[in-house]
Amino acid sequence: MRGLPRGRGLMRARGRGRAAPTGGRGRGRGGAHRGRGRPRSLLSLPRAQASWAPQLPAGLTGPPVPCLPSQGEAPAEMGALLLEKEPRGAAERVHSSLGDTPQSEETLPKANPDSLEPAGPSSPASVTVTVGDEGADTPVGAASLIGDEPESLEGDGGRIVLGHATKSFPSSPSKGGACPSRAKMSMTGAGKSPPSVQSLAMRLLSMPGAQGAATAGPEPSPATTAAQEGQPKVHRARKTMSKPSNGQPPIPEKRPPEVQHFRMSDDMHLGKVTSDVAKRRKLNSGSLSEDLGSAGGSGDIILEKGEPRPLEEWETVVGDDFSLYYDAYSVDERVDSDSKSEVEALAEQLSEEEEEEEEEEEEEEEEEEEEEEEEEDEESGNQSDRSGSSGRRKAKKKWRKDSPWVKPSRKRRKREPPRAKEPRGVNGVGSSGPSEYMEVPLGSLELPSEGTLSPNHAGVSNDTSSLETERGFEELPLCSCRMEAPKIDRISERAGHKCMATESVDGELLGCNAAILKRETMRPSSRVALMVLCEAHRARMVKHHCCPGCGYFCTAGTFLECHPDFRVAHRFHKACVSQLNGMVFCPHCGEDASEAQEVTIPRGDGGTPPIGTAAPALPPLAHDAPGRADTSQPSARMRGHGEPRRPPCDPLADTIDSSGPSLTLPNGGCLSAVGLPPGPGREALEKALVIQESERRKKLRFHPRQLYLSVKQGELQKVILMLLDNLDPNFQSDQQSKRTPLHAAAQKGSVEICHVLLQAGANINAVDKQQRTPLMEAVVNNHLEVARYMVQLGGCVYSKEEDGSTCLHHAAKIGNLEMVSLLLSTGQVDVNAQDSGGWTPIIWAAEHKHIDVIRMLLTRGADVTLTDNEENICLHWASFTGSAAIAEVLLNAQCDLHAVNYHGDTPLHIAARESYHDCVLLFLSRGANPELRNKEGDTAWDLTPERSDVWFALQLNRKLRLGVGNRAVRTEKIICRDVARGYENVPIPCVNGVDGEPCPEDYKYISENCETSTMNIDRNITHLQHCTCVDDCSSSNCLCGQLSIRCWYDKDGRLLQEFNKIEPPLIFECNQACSCWRSCKNRVVQSGIKVRLQLYRTAKMGWGVRALQTIPQGTFICEYVGELISDAEADVREDDSYLFDLDNKDGEVYCIDARYYGNISRFINHLCDPNIIPVRVFMLHQDLRFPRIAFFSSRDIRTGEELGFDYGDRFWDIKSKYFTCQCGSEKCKHSAEAIALEQSRLARLDPHPELLPDLSSLPPINT
């Protein structure tokens, strides 16, 4: 193999043949003897079976001898059957053939063997014979319907049979009738069968040919044509497949029982309460536990009373900057600010001494912040945040640079607003406690400072007019769950450096006394006092699990959840919803709360603290926090341990039914995560879509090439931005070798980018300059998830790149077993596909030592005998890599140990040259011959370094071979590597372990029937009945399948279990006139031999054929191929051992003679217990005189089992005088013992002829 250049040697299909018995002079089936006056045998198909040999009237294309019953025998019934089964247009010719008027036997037309034209009325009358005692006259041409048996004559030996010794189905010895003079093999079958649907339909096959051929019969009379046109159209009976019911009820969607949609009723939307009640609910500073209990019990949400205002008034009151949206921080983990007033209020708490010390620095910083604000407004269009304030946006910008728990700068100073701002606190007076904490109102909306978001205390007007005025300026207060306030030492000191969180657990309030690590304060909204929290509750606060209305953590019980994003859940109590103008909104994000889901969280799933002992009351709640319980006095509460806890998982993260975020492209497409498998890729895509949806996109211009570069870098956000800018996802540039962005995404393994590109219209099967598809890129780069995603979306798995490689080649090369399994599971890949070097996937796997891949490929039908361009098989490559384990697997799969490549090297040569000791020992133990020489005259011993381990092994094997060279038992040796010489799909080797007989060479191997004289076969393509299927011809509407009664092949190309093996029907495969693909399932025989066979020398029957693999039942084996000759030519042939009768009716019939031209089937022997059956098949033409004979397995065939079929009794009636059957079966009927027993039985019955039954009136019955 010379370092094994890229090319591998071809091992062709194994051959087998029929062996002659011992003592026989001729070669072939049964070893026919040559002798004077000896009759010759003919292989023939079964006689007189309606489904096999349809009787056609004279005048049709390729007509058999007409066989119609005489007058009075029911011609009308046959005509009626024909009319019922034949389409309109053919009925006239049928009636013209059968006759519409009663006709005597003298006027019946008779077939002319020399012409295709029907005999006219002046033709000689057909001779009739009397059958039985009924005296019914039957034309001689109809004898095949009744069955003819050879006539027994008395002579030497007691039983001399004259005539044809036809190989046919098993039948009882005949007592009368004429006997043919040739020994023909035929298909076995019963006697007369009633006309079947297929036999009557077959009468129409040649009518288009008869219509268009020059030798067509006469035109029907006008009267006959007119009579047929007046008849109603007769429909063919078709078999249909059951269809699923259209009324099948839809499968109900399964949802968790505890998750239910909470929708506001019409009464809630339209209900009216007094303004005092609404204001009291909003500003109540009393005990909230009682209020919560009442709200939870009733389940009602009370809305504020107010008349709906027109849109103009709303715009005037609220302003242009008011907006409700969910901030992208929930996805990208950036710090979010929800209220400007909180930041500025914190700044107000700095002492006056600190302000004086830092005044100069803060003035300089103010000027810098104003410049940044102007630049940001110009760039982003002054887009406001939830409060619409630019000051809030500045604070957010500063906090983004820090960690999620950010401590604001101590240098931030309180700015003077353009108008006076009143501090909000208890009675409007600022104090030092938490209850005296002061906030600035939302200046951007110019809301009044008191009465809107602050509690109703003394000194504040609470009359109706005041409330109505405040309602007009009311805005939705949003949460501040993701904001931190500066350290306030007195709050943490007052709490004893313990967590101040209060949890709502099944209607009970439980406190947490875990130690705090940070002193920065947090709160869910401005209605709740600031508090210090432990790390577990800080994490839950960021997840929006703290209700902004009451400040309690929603831990266990029944709550409402708002889902602005697929993975974000805002929890709050039903009584704490935000209300505005008769509508309810989420207190976290301001989304419509009527679509919120009501969820029930069991105790322990939401981070419920362990119950401990009662502890003193906590001080986080102030009098200025509406909706919170008054905790100024000590209260008995159960507290948990102070150890930090892990942030609890969202119990609804996997149960939320949402399609997620989406974006609409300029071309009308939609970008979303729907259809993307769960995983990091889907999460990244959802995050990018939310960011893109929430942020204002900048007007940027991109070059089409930039999309490829961004995809290659994995920049998902930029890719989405470019697709929204209407960049072409199928743009191909010469600089990237015509690769599309989808190629780059598949190469990188980014399934989320592949998803958005395909949604934007990318071609999943686009090819680059090397004809490589994106799926190939994913396979080559070993990205299984991308490959699985593309296969699910219809990526082509069988396309080939420039060098002929397929996806399976690359998967086998890299050794990814899951990838190989994925590709094979599609059923669309060719496991034996060869690239430009002739290498198959199993060769690549053998070269790269992927034994698991090799085992999988072998189970899927990989052929180990295929060779590359240098005639190397996969065993050569296994020996080149030195893998003894792979070599043993291949040898167990019947790989040829003695295969030679272009240089004459065997696998042993290569293993010895590379000094692979294990491989050399394996090959020697399996019988490798170390004396074989390559083209340079070297043996394996010559290629081995002297005195190496391999050298000693070869020396020892040589001595052992010399010691056993004279043993009596012979071993099989390959005498020909392929008797087909490459004409078949698989090589057929020839072996001999019996004698010194060489490989048979007295014939010419052909793979198709040939002709040595003109046969006038109708090959006109316009005469072919064909289908118009666009699928794989699996439906019942396929015309070719209807001609065969049905399509008899399954998806694996095997005969169905219900196929009649005793009387096989005609099979019409799809032909070149059909509209279906060449790969449709109704093309089996025309695809050639696919099973591995071997021609071997038998002990008693000469050459035989055996299987080199397990063959399932119904598998196509091979076709009986030979020379097409007429019956008259067969009578003058010297050797009749290879004749196969194409039709067992008398008259002008034809045969296949495989004596001088044939294939492997000429060596198949007779078996009384056969394992294969012959079937008539039509493919390239539909001339019924010339069917093709295909052999199918009638049962499962084991590896090494000999193949054989039943030649038929007619064959043995002639040949039994010269030799007997040697099959050795227990059911053998033609052995010497069986013949002796039969002769003894007949001899006992001869002295008593009265004991014999009178069978003269009964037609013969074939068995």
UniProtKB/Swiss-Prot annotation:
Segments for region (Interaction with histone H3): 1127-1146, 1207-1210
Complex and partners: Heterodimer; heterodimerizes with EHMT1/GLP. Interacts with GFI1B and WIZ. Part of the E2F6.com-1 complex in G0 phase composed of E2F6, MGA, MAX, TFDP1, CBX3, BAT8, EHMT1, RING1, RNF2, MBLR, L3MBTL2 and YAF2. Part of a complex composed of TRIM28, HDAC1, HDAC2 and EHMT2. Interacts with UHRF1. Interacts with CDYL. Interacts with REST only in the presence of CDYL. Part of a complex containing at least CDYL, REST, WIZ, SETB1, EHMT1 and EHMT2. Interacts with PRDM9 and CDYL; interaction only takes place when PRDM9 is bound to hotspot DNA. Interacts with SMYD5.
Compartments it resides in: Nucleus; Chromosome
Ranges for region Disordered: 1-314, 332-439, 621-647
Reactions catalysed: N(6)-methyl-L-lysyl(9)-[histone H3] + S-adenosyl-L-methionine = N(6),N(6)-dimethyl-L-lysyl(9)-[histone H3] + S-adenosyl-L-homocysteine + H(+); L-lysyl(9)-[histone H3] + S-adenosyl-L-methionine = N(6)-methyl-L-lysyl(9)-[histone H3] + S-adenosyl-L-homocysteine + H(+)
Protein name in the entry: Histone-lysine N-methyltransferase EHMT2
Residues covered by the SET domain: 1091-1208
Main location: nucleus
Primary enzyme class: transferase
Substitution effect: residue 1162 to H: Strongly reduces histone methyltransferase activity
Domain notes: The ANK repeats bind H3K9me1 and H3K9me2. The SET domain mediates interaction with WIZ.
Site (Histone H3K9me binding): 1120
Organism this protein belongs to: Mus musculus (Mouse)
Biased amino acid composition, Basic residues: 26-39, 391-400
Biased composition annotated in UniProt, kind: Basic and acidic residues: 83-95, 252-270, 302-312, 332-343
GO CC annotation terms, alphabetical: chromatin; nuclear speck; nucleoplasm; nucleus
GO terms, molecular function: C2H2 zinc finger domain binding; histone H3K27 methyltransferase activity; histone H3K56 methyltransferase activity; histone H3K9 methyltransferase activity; histone H3K9me2 methyltransferase activity; p53 binding; promoter-specific chromatin binding; protein-lysine N-methyltransferase activity
Phenotype upon changing residue 1120 to V: In GM7; defective in methyltransferase activity without affecting DNA methylation
Swiss-Prot/TrEMBL ANK repeat ranges: 702-731, 737-766, 770-799, 803-833, 837-866, 870-899, 903-932
Keywords: ANK repeat, Chromatin regulator, Chromosome, Isopeptide bond, Metal-binding, Methylation, Methyltransferase, Nucleus, Phosphoprotein, Repeat, S-adenosyl-L-methionine, Transferase, Ubl conjugation, Zinc
UniProt modification remark: Methylated at Lys-239; automethylated.
Asymmetric dimethylarginine modifications at: 40
N6,N6-dimethyllysine: modified positions: 239
Residues with the N6,N6,N6-trimethyllysine modification: 239
